[in-house]
Amino acid sequence: KGKMKPLVAAKPDCVICMSCGDGVQCVAKNAPGIPTYPSNNTMYLGEAVRFGVWEEACHFCGDCVLGQTGGICPITQCAKSLVNGPCGGQKNGKCEVNPENDCAWIKIYKRLEEIGQLDKLGKTREDKGYAKFSYPRTISLKGKK
């Protein structure tokens, strides 16, 4: 907030903010009377897989289950965001909704097995109601101009 004072005092016509949507909102809130515009569209929190390709990693759901699922997020990695195990529709380890993706729950099972924590699969977690979304998303610049 204190760092915004020189900007506000300069009375610019507008502010173009190079940040995620939260940053744009923060600047707008602290720059009264100054229009604030995003320079980019925030898609999601993800990780770079290789140049020009990112994969979604977190939904900021506020009810993190990573400690129970071996560090693999079922809300983000499962297309149906199932938190208590697989849907049963996977084929050859691939997701039935998006066959390009590995089944999140097979990945979770393998990870928990690897770290000696398969007992965590027996815990029931409350459904988060994220079924209306389709995750994980991937953004690729390949073929874009």
Predicted regions and their residues:
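Iron-sulfur (Fe-S) cluster-binding modules
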Residues: 2-15, 28-68, 72-145
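Short, well-ordered alpha-helical microsegments
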Residues: 23-26
